[in-house]
């Protein structure tokens, strides 16, 4: 009985996991950043705050790597007044830096228009908090043009809806029982990898299902996709996509023996064949109905 009473609901466990994860990331940011994340807590999901924390950490690493004033700084030495010491040109340089940079592990990271827009939105929100409260006297992010989005979104969801969708796939089976729970758990890591990849890179569903195991390059965090017309190109991904792919590869994919002719396929169906476009579309719609029942979701084929 005690075990049953201590069992957390899906939402409770998600909140706990994400809160602990955010606390760990905040340890890698300047101490004053905690005030911002505490302030936005009521209006954002934990997953959104985690994404913003990663994005803002990139900004401070950029300053330490590229701005002579902060060349010898450690992350703990930054104070809030350093924000108002920057000029619009510094923010523009950061925006340019985001297109291609190396992370802590020396992996080359690139950002699509969507990724660039999200990171700049995070920085503007961060600055806006301190400026609105008159903690800093100027906000250079307001004087910089934000990136325009031209690419078509694969799934038309806002940031919080995306967070809810991924959280549901991660923990939605917690309250299920029997065969429903068994099926949910069997496909969870695969589905989470697919959704995170689609949302994190903007590739088409047809490009996603066409991926082979050898198309993934974890050394540079890139995937080789075949575009319409047969042209191939490398699309780079971030830490969240990397983690989701590795979890899937080291669990579900490793434990599945593919049928003959499907040995190289990255994403396998429960029938041990390469997943098709229709199967992924149905999977996306299934989860989206649970999270946004009043919103029609159509993945980008």
Language model region names:
Residues 1-301:
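Conserved catalytic core of the tyrosine transesterase superfamily
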């Amino acid at each position: 009985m005690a075990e049953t009473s201590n069992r957390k609901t899906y939402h409770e466990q998600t909140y706990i996991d994400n809160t602990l994860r955010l606390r760990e990331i905040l340890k890698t940011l300047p101490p004053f950043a905690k005030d911002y994340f505490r302030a936005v807590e009521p209006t954002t999901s934990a997953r959104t705050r985690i994404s913003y924390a990663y994005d803002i950490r990139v900004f401070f690493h950029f300053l330490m790597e590229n701005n002579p004033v902060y060349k010898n700084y450690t992350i703990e030495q930054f104070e809030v007044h350093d924000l108002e010491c920057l000029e619009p040109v510094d923010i523009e340089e950061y925006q340019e830096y985001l297109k291609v940079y190396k992370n802590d592990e020396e992996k080359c990271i690139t950002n699509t228009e969507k990724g660039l827009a999200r990171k700049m939105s995070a920085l503007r929100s961060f600055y806006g908090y301190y400026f609105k409260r008159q903690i800093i006297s100027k906000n250079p992010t307001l004087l910089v043009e934000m990136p325009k989005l031209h690419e078509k979104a694969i799934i038309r969801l806002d940031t919080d809806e995306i967070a809810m969708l991924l959280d549901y796939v991660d923990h939605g089976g917690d309250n299920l029982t029997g065969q429903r729970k068994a099926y949910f758990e069997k496909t969870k890591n695969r589905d989470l990898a697919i959704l995170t990849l689609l949302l994190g890179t903007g590739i088409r569903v047809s490009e996603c299902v066409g991926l082979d195991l050898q198309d993934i390059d974890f050394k540079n965090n890139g995937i080789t996709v075949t575009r319409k017309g047969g042209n191939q190109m490398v699309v780079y991904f971030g830490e969240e996509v990397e983690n989701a792919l590795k979890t899937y590869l080291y669990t579900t994919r490793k434990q599945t023996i593919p049928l003959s002719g499907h040995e190289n396929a990255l994403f396998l169906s429960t029938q041990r064949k390469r997943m098709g476009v229709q199967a992924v579309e149905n999977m996306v719609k299934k989860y989206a109905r649970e999270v946004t029942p009043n919103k029609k979701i159509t993945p980008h084929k």
